[in-house]
């Protein structure tokens, strides 16, 4: 009736959100700081491999995890250290929400693969809980919370392509003139991010060499111009030598990708996933097929970038007393 207030929205029975994996097109690692962290300059690109998180009201916080497309989730924690669960709890605490949720994660991104799957879980959990509890905090506020959970969480929320500085949490969007096509080769085991950074520090101390000069301008120019050859030439990762020292098979994986026709290959982040740049999505599919005899189909993923950041896929309302949802 005219003048009546809008009815209260129905309570939500569940919310499902997803967030993308990332590849580092550039990763410059500064000297180790007194607090143990390193100043980074990186170019993130979100890619079309996703983590999907569903949150439902519960009496207490809990989490379950399943793998999608052959992703091994055996190493994913199911306790209070899980990033998605930590994200839900942190948002409830900061927003003054006195309700708990059960978090269910469907993982497509390799675990401990240098593609920020755990950070994507946290980003999706923040977006899902924000929707479930009708907080409407906005991405910037969620990203500020996300930075407390991990350096890659803010990028998981924003997605696309961005330059990251600090520990990677300060983001500036980068315009891209074309999409990128990738083949990701999964390793048979994971690599510890702290161990890779420590090996990078050790190698620099042993050789007396500091961080090499960066290629940020070259990467940005290649992205703006949509030039796949220039992008391939500009790909750079200061952690690659350290990752290859800890897992010598990685160098062979990069070389195999180049021999099979990849424009370029790079260890993704701290590894051990190897990212192979292709000329097009069709070329990426052919490259993956050519690499199957070497690595097996279960260790190969194709994807494109840039992909959007975390977003809600589905919000299910609680049925009304009359039976309608």
Swiss-Prot record:
EC category name: transferase
Residues engaged in binding ATP: 110-120
Enzyme active site: 22, 152
Keyword ATP-binding recorded: yes
GO molecular function, one term: ATP binding
EC number annotated for this UniProt entry: 2.7.1.148
Pfam families reported for this sequence: GHMP_kinases_C (PF08544), GHMP_kinases_N (PF00288)
Keywords annotated in UniProt: ATP-binding, Isoprene biosynthesis, Kinase, Nucleotide-binding, Transferase
InterPro entries: GHMP_kinase_C_dom, GHMP_kinase_C_sf, GHMP_kinase_N_dom, IspE, Ribosomal_Su5_D2-typ_SF, Ribsml_uS5_D2-typ_fold_subgr
Region (Disordered): 306-325
Tree of life domain: Bacteria
Record-stated family: Belongs to the GHMP kinase family. IspE subfamily.
Protein purpose: Catalyzes the phosphorylation of the position 2 hydroxy group of 4-diphosphocytidyl-2C-methyl-D-erythritol.
Protein name in the entry: 4-diphosphocytidyl-2-C-methyl-D-erythritol kinase
